[in-house]
Amino acid sequence: MKRLRLYLMAAMTILNGGMMAASAAEYEVSSPNGKVKVMVTAEEAVRWSVTYDGLTVLMPSEIKISLQQAGKSLGLGKVGKVAKKQVKSSFENPFYRKSTVRDDYGQLLMYTNQKMTIEVRAYDDGAAYRLISGHTKPTLVKDELAEFCFEADYQAFVPYVNDNRSGERYCYSFESYYDEQPLSAMFTDSLAITPLAVCLPDGVKAIVMDAGVENYPGMMVRSEKLKVKGEKYKVKGEKLRAVFAPYPLEQEIGGYDRLNLVPTKRADYIAKLNGRQALPWRVVVITERDADILNCDMAQRLAPACRIADTSWIRPGKVAWDWWNNTNISGVNFTSGMNTNTYLYYIDFAAKNHLEYIIIDEGWSGKESLMSELNPEIDLKRLIAYGLEKGVGIILWSSWRNLIGSDPLGGNAVSDQVMKHYADMGIKGFKVDFFDRDDQQVIASAYQLAACAARHHLVLDYHGLKPFGIQRAYPNIFNFEGVKGLENSKWEPRVGDGPLHNQPRYDVTAPYLRMLAGPMDYTPGAMSNAMKDSFFGNNDHPMSQGTRVHQMAMYTTFEAPLQMLADSPTKYMQNQECTDFIAQIPTTFDETITLDGQLGEYTLIARRKGTTWYVAAMTDWTPRDLNVDLSFLGPGQYQADIFADGVNAAKEATDYQHIRQSVSSTDRLAIHLSSGGGWTAIIRANR
């Protein structure tokens, strides 16, 4: 492996209180374990570079911002004083995969002569920087230059922007399969979503993303050629450059089924700042063991702290969902569909199986109003009262546009009226769909909606949007879509002898990348399962690619404080022992341990809630034999309730084995995953 170390200039001096002299041109900060080192040079331009245990992760990559204030052009300015320190801290989060999050890092604070600060952090598992504007007057951000420069043409996992709404370049669903290709093969005319993974030598992964986004657009990237010449480097590499959606000036109703607000005119700037503001973090997560990505807390650490003083009313849980199964229930004496009897039935199913919620998806109201265009076949008051009696909350679907009216930044009155009305009725939350943008207006609107919902004790599930840090500030936002989830199986085409897309491979890629940014509403739980040769897309009677236990393992593997049961009550009742198992799995945890895994190949993870452990493994279409090391268990004997792929699962995907056995911390379980398969267990201490 080519190793390249960067050193501080001999001229650098350290002053009292951790301040460095302004005459220094280079500054270095290290992670607590010393493996991650960030070098910032501040000469003709400001650049950062990152190494991991001597390996070059990022070549010098420019940091720049272009501002305009009262017609005057401003920039980053020249670096003056620099403060350096090590920070050790932690915080609690009861709505996450672990109850306590460590936040230990090395920090540089670099102050410039144009009221800007560059904050740099080095963590044991990555590095990040952000710009902080000290300007108190209204300021336009014309552009921000954020680069991620790599010294070679490395392989990458790239989620491209696609499915643009009404042809608008920056209006899309944030859903994408991963193109696995060299950086040089990236489409230079296309934008990519982050997180995006770059595969470095010796198995090291560098994952590019943003974090802590607020009142600012989200980050996409595009590829560029990198040519560097100088004393330290003579290489031709590849570069990822940040791209931000320009600020919308005009917009109209359009997009999918006219549910979007689509910008028709954008400004020549990306953001408006109305005072001092910290801009989002530019992040590279670094791991040499893929499994560690599944337990990386970078997005949580760099997010704004919780802003809800009393969170005791927030109730994570599982939810029975109607849309994927097309309300196809049987053995009843009424016509199923968007009507009161159907949802009374869903409430009964949820109550019997100890599910906290049901969702009433699109169709309970009109597309233009949540207040005046109500479906006469739905008696909401009756459903709410019945749900209250049964201990089941109701979540309603809404488009983003329905909740905010026609003005993303002026919709507070609309959303407050709607949310107060339905909260007073007894509704527990909204699934907010078709954001399909992350420009500054939409990010600001997402925060406004979350704050409004919190005031009325409502939970939220954001669709058409990826997580960007808001979920820590407002934990009443349970979930985000922005994932190629189970819904895609309804329209997945066949090509040749199988489906067009390799869904099982995506299922063991997204947890490493998409889930790194935050929870994902994949909506698992298909009870109709198929191998490649027998799978086909079907809207009314959908199925999943891979085995039954592949689906069951998702409930432990995929993070979602609000986790869907996507199939119909009929299917779940026909497979009651699978349903009983799924219903026992929590949606938030006290501890997470990653046991094994390989990006795009398989996952093996353990999570603890109280004294009970939940363990799961998933694979792509490649069958695998793995060992589950149970040394994480405490002393004594435990009882393991296990679902494993059946002997014939490679032919009949619904085939499974249900095993109960005694285990202890000294055991290593040999498990077999069938093609597209899974394995999952609940392990409880003997009493």
Segments (PLM) and residue ranges:
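An acidic-aromatic substrate-binding cleft motif
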Residues: 270, 274-353, 357
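Edge strands and adjacent loops of beta-rich recognition modules
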Residues: 96-102, 581-605
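Bacterial Sec-dependent N-terminal signal peptides
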Residues: 1-26
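C-terminal beta-strand-rich structural cap/linker in extracellular carbohydrate-active enzymes
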Residues: 661-687
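Aromatic- and carboxylate-enriched substrate-binding clefts and catalytic-loop regions
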Residues: 360-543, 547
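N-terminal accessory beta-strand-rich subdomains and adjacent acidic, glycine-rich linkers
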Residues: 26-302, 306
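Catalytic cores of secreted or luminal carbohydrate-active enzymes
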Residues: 549, 553-595
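Carbohydrate-binding surface patches
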Residues: 599-635, 679-680
